[in-house]
Amino acid sequence: MSNHHAVVKTQAELAELFAQDLTCGVGRSVKHDSAAKHVSGEAQYIDDRLEFPNQLHLYARMSDRAHARILSIDTAPCYAFDGVRIAITHEDVPGLKDIGPLMPGDPLLAIDTVQFVGQVVLAVAARDLETARKAAMAAVIEYEDLEPVLDVVEAFRNKHFVLDSHTHQRGDSAGALATAKHRIQGTLHIGGQEHFYLETQISSVMPTEDGGMIVYCSTQNPTEVQKLVAEVLDVSMNKIVVDMRRMGGGFGGKETQAASPACLCAVVARLTGQPTKMRLPRVEDMLMTGKRHPFYIEYDVGFDDTGRLHGINLELAGNCGCSPDLSNSIVDRAMFHADNSYYLGDATVNGHRCKTNTASNTAYRGFGGPQGMVAIEEVMDAIARHLGLDPLAVRKVNYYGKTERNVTHYYQTVEHNMLEEMTAELEASSQYAERREAIRLYNAHSPILKKGLALTPVKFGISFTASFLNQAGALIHIYTDGSIHLNHGGTEMGQGLNTKVAQVVAEVFQVDIDRVQITATNTDKVPNTSPTAASSGADLNGKAAQNAAETIKQRLVEFASRKYDVSEADVEFHNGHVRVRDQILTFESLIQQAYFAQVSLSSTGFYKTPKIFYDRSQARGRPFYYFAFGAACCEVIVDTLTGEYKMLRTDILHDVGASLNPAIDIGQVEGGFIQGMGWLTMEELVWNNKGKLMTNGPASYKIPAVADMPLDLRVKLVENRKNPEDTVFHSKAVGEPPFMLGIASWCAIKDAVASVGEYRHQPRIDAPATPERVLWGCEQMRQLQAAKAVEAETEMASL
């Protein structure tokens, strides 16, 4: 029989332990709580769970038409397959038939028409997935084809929108453009991006005895899944519990898109009384779900001899797909970030929500911000080529100031501006000036291989643009042995959120992080959660957990003060111990004393972000609590005969405030940069003329591999610079801002191609800059050079 009695330590021994620093609190590089499980395969995902007895497997039959009227659906052939339990259409949904997250437009099962190739028309549940698939494909669906809209430019020109356009305006941009010394116009196409999470969309639903459901779902938004499942079943939300331990990746793709499998499973489970599971194969996942919004950009800019902007008109046309989904907020954020780090002067920024017959596009890391930033970075490069200046010089002359030229085009003051200092530090550490000169010399003597260099900044606003989402809850229990149980409303998708929130709680109580146990996110423990998105996971949930921990800690301080007849200031927590004036207790002994004194050792916590507001009718406000800053310097080499390129070196300096966990934050910066680089260089989505996505698997859709990383990648976090706002331990969000660092790679490729034209012409290279587009850009430069040579010869001949 084991001995559970702890060894009693002397006061001297306790004092020595008390004096030591906590090794796993805030600011420490604590290992990700599931790191070992991830690499060993022990981490449990939904598909790893033991199957329930009598569990059904669900397969969705998707539309093969981009736009058509449904004339008839015959599911009778489905039942010819042994093992089929049920086939459902929209007529079988007991409650609400539309699962649009904020407004209607997303029927769970197609009703009268189909709007894109991949829309779910019917679903079949059977004893195994293969039987369900064969049966679903046997159903007979008759269509009458309708004319689809597949091109975002066509939708933009014809004002074919899912929602009304929105405008940010400051000053008289038309007047500024008319009087500017220099004026250029241009267009740009920015491609979308597949989330390509390792774990595809999946849900498993278990009916309960009281008519409710337990939903195991890979989702960034458990409360929304809970709400929508309740609505399609026509029951109250308290009948539905959503359980989410971890996702195998999300990137925004499981913010709204996870609801469809969960709701389909719930309908089948309600109709059959049997547990039901749906896991999308990769091809079906890519066809059925939305992507990052592609954008079409038109710009008209006026500027002076230094490249400083005087006026700008920007048209941002987002391809929203067939329904609103989150597009209103996504296009808004593109507009909010169409300045990136630059004072635009007199500005008009129009955001358009274009409707096409493709899958409804959705949230993706950056949430529209990257597309807005790419637009203005294209403008900066175009100005530099027009004037024959270094693009970095043009960028710096347009930076926001600290006391003037410091208000955005939506009237938020840019506070705590770090752009100049960070750029200067990165310029020096990356040896930008020396390398710029060396690259110009190299290119002058290298006719085929050309090098490019770019240094681009990032200023990214942190907060949900939908203000009501800026709230979070948490629940903490302390047990009598001193162990701590933590639940919060955030979801873990590999980004280390659970580790960071556990560090926050460990820091408050000054205990080892091993004492803190985090379990699955459950809607019956922390209700009304916001999605884990907008880089807000640690900001919101960390603050809520801190609030809950501080509440319990204050009770303990008050108890110790009364019990030992000391002031509250005499009670100090440190390194797993509590000093009460001259006496030192272990943390667990104080907990036991408090329990016997009937002190509550449990608390909820809550947090809402202060200061933020946005008046949409006036198009002005403070939509962001603060800005996160960053800068990246990329060097690339391009083969101008093939368009192929290689990233040679990348230097990154990124601002995370007082880092909660430097190791995790550096990992997020590295991963964000690579994902952003992939979006702008190789990740190309291609649809055929019938509206079918052809790049629908890893064989045709290319994401960055190890070999695509820069040969030399150097990442540094800004040191000794706390977030001046009252965030969790004065940290800053790190999920999305590093993604935009990848813009430097695209700009470096354009810089290399521009060297073919002696840096005086802006190459037309839409994003992603695939080798084909890079080659076209090189040919464009060669043709311009050839035309210039002919013009020079003609002029000489005329003399």
What label would you give each PLM region?
Residues 33-37, 58, 137-144, 150, ...:
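Extended active-site and interfacial segments that coordinate phosphate-rich ligands
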Residues 4-7, 90-91, 234-239, 269-276, ...:
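C-terminal catalytic domains of large/alpha subunits in multi-subunit enzymes
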Residues 28, 33-41, 166-203, 294-379, ...:
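Glycine-rich loop/linker segments at domain edges
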Residues 248-273, 277-279, 497-505:
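Thiamine diphosphate
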Residues 127, 274-320, 543-572, 576:
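Phosphate/diphosphate-binding loops
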Residues 153-233, 399-483, 694-708, 712-716:
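Helix-loop-helix junctions that connect adjacent transmembrane helices in secondary transporters/permeases
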Residues 43, 202-207, 296-305, 311-316, ...:
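Short beta-strand elements
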Residues 1-165, 183-186, 271:
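Flexible, low-hydrophobicity surface segments
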